[in-house]
Amino acid sequence: MNKMLRYLSDYKRESVLAPLFKMLEATFDLFVPLVMADIVNVGIAAHDFHYILVRCGILLLLAIVGLTCSLTAQYFSAKAAVGYSTGLRHALFEHIQTLSFSEMDTMGTSTLITRMTSDVNQVQSGLNLFLRLFLRSPFVVFGAMIMAFTVNFRAALIFVVAIPLLSIVVFGVMVITRPLYKSVQTRLDRVLGLTRENLTGVRVVRAFDKEKSEVDRFEDANELLTKMQLHVGHISALMNPLTYVIINLAIVALLYVGSIEINIGGMASGDVIALVNYMNQILVELVKLANLIVQVSKALACAGRVQAVLDTKPGMEFPAQLTGNVPAEKAGDAVRFDHVSLTYKGAGAPSLSDISFTARRGQTIGVIGGTGSGKSSLISLIPRFYDATEGSVEIMGRPVRQYPRADLRSKVAVVMQKAQLFGGTIRSNLLWGSQNASDADLWAALETAQAAEFVKAKPLGLDEPVEQGGRNLSGGQKQRLTIARALVGKPDILILDDSASALDYATDAALRKALAALPGDLTVFIVSQRAASLQHADQIIVLDDGRMVGLGRHAELLESCPVYKEIYESQFKKGDAQK
């Protein structure tokens, strides 16, 4: 947990001043009962209106100064807490960007979002409360007891008995409810996870008429949360009546002892009022202290979860610079797999087994296979989204692990299955491919991706707004824009991971023709469910259950590969393939 304190290093001054100003406020509060006692003992007893007025002025001054100190402390604590959470959130987001797909798969997107949002916010709230109360509350408790002894020693002995009893009740309730609050947080995370999952997949829910089952599933989780919250609430609700019973008994004892002391001349009636006020101050601060401990406990639990993400080391290390030379015999290679196998973390069986092939520069490589055959797993090894568990993957004659991250990303462009665009404009999305691209480069990429026509039809052209996720574009338009984005960077290797599935056959064919006509030695990997889309590829890799069962051209595979022949003929008979 000490590691997380470094994000508070820029706010040391605020972290010191906030509790100091709260202690100043508490100091002024401790003098209020004494001034009130003076008003009763001297002003009211002597019917001295001027004395009462002066003491009321002192009370007003104490209130104003105390309020000023409180606001100042609040400013410094809020500044420190907000600054801390900003730095923590930035560090967390930056660290997440370094994680490989393996770590992302293990933790899950929804978990990381929770860590970035609610957990960091909880840490911020806990820190803000801690800076304001961790010194003030103990200071007031002990200060009020000391001040009570200055008023009357015998009466103050009641405080010695009452404070431990109050502490037992307050902290006893806190100890019991603390683990229960953790259970509440766990169940709340479950409810939030279900909500996020439902809202993310709302179209699928509606398509399958699953609204009722989703409501039932949410209701079950919400009911468990409600029961736990009620259980904790019932226990927490015991705090106020129990503490007030102790306080009232203590006040009765104070009044009894005070009346005796007044009769024998040991103290005045105003002193009894002061002692009662000190007792109330102690009660308030003990309750605040208990709430502080509960909130800090929640914050520490959240901080632990955030720290767990920060402690997660990236599974991949990229070198700082490219070293070594490419052997002459590999100068023409674009991609080479040498007995490559891949087993995902936590998976029982390998997703890829003993894959070997070589793709030459300028070739078009098709990848086909049934659902779950390992197509996406295979192409994810080329840009090193995952590391092969066995064998080696080479890019342009070098092992992929020798490439710095930036060099590898500039050489390999990937268009994912799900077309993902970001809020902004068409231009800003295309510039992800290369920040230095000119308008001519953007239009050239759009022409190749068969997207220029619909972009030109937009009122603002390249500056047409794009909503988050590309909600204002059709599926085919989004896919073509993501292909254009990949082409803007002019990569050596382009991977299309079933990224033309929303295109009609004519557009798909035009895209493949345009890619083949590009100058240079662009190597293209096309993952597709359509055998017709791969007929003209230089090589077609056929996968079945993670194994390569065929490698060759279309005509060769029809003769030698039963799996490919079955795929092709099943589509041809349905009229979905072209000769």
Q: Model-found features: residue ranges?
A:
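Helix-loop-helix
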Residues: 47-54, 147-161, 231-305, 309-310
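Transmembrane helix-loop-helix hairpins at lipid-water interfaces of multipass membrane proteins
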Residues: 9, 15-72, 76, 149-154, ...
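Short intracellular "coupling" helices and adjacent cytoplasmic loop segments at the cytosolic face
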Residues: 46-47, 82, 90-114, 118-120, ...
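ABC-type nucleotide-binding domain
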Residues: 326-579
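An intracellular "coupling" helix at the cytosolic face of ABC transporter transmembrane type-1 domains
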Residues: 10-13, 98-102, 118-127, 131, ...
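Hydrophobic alpha-helical transmembrane segments of ABC transporter permease domains
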Residues: 20, 24, 28-32, 57, ...
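A short amphipathic helical element positioned immediately N-terminal to and/or at the very start
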Residues: 1-10, 112
